[in-house]
């Protein structure tokens, strides 16, 4: 029995699709059957050797092949440090372009996830560099960072695509908002700018007020945007939104689930939502 099937992994199982691609594809099919798309994420980060990066690249290429052959409706998310950024920027760019090329042939969008603050500039720069050639890619922006509104403005200016999230990483007060009200307000500022200046973007939030404002803004600006939520978090709300909106469920899988789970558990607001989701089933 795999560790993810053990009693101690009850909470992780709420978020994680499984430890292997087969289980992840099965879960993706189930989600697709509910008229929801998926953002599939093979878990991995902070890789310091080419050997580990190449192992992850093999998994990501298999993921794209399986999504195509099994007709999975959705996109994938990859982390820069999973695909070689710590080794070198040029190595990361080479791997990112390989992923984009294959994904483009399959009609699959690739999201660049955002990581620790020191990787933000290189992530955005690389995204904008390859966005010129590949239109099937977007980048994640964390509203808790004080710099994010300027990043959103820059990306929108280049017709890029943003997936706006609150952010799960811990940052000092010099670079990030600490009060949840400030994070909320910055999220709204970034979202308003996207509605005013961008054609395609995703609002990834479990917050009722943010979702309501986004739906009302669709009517105000005559736009159809995408919404995103985490697997196993407020699933009934996601299903309700999916009745009339483009809902995308973030679907992580793989053996490296610990860091991802710890980040989620470190957020009290997320933890309350997840505990409620587990109790309610």
Summary of predicted features, one role per range:
Residues 1-281:
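Positively charged, amphipathic and often flexible ligand-engagement surfaces
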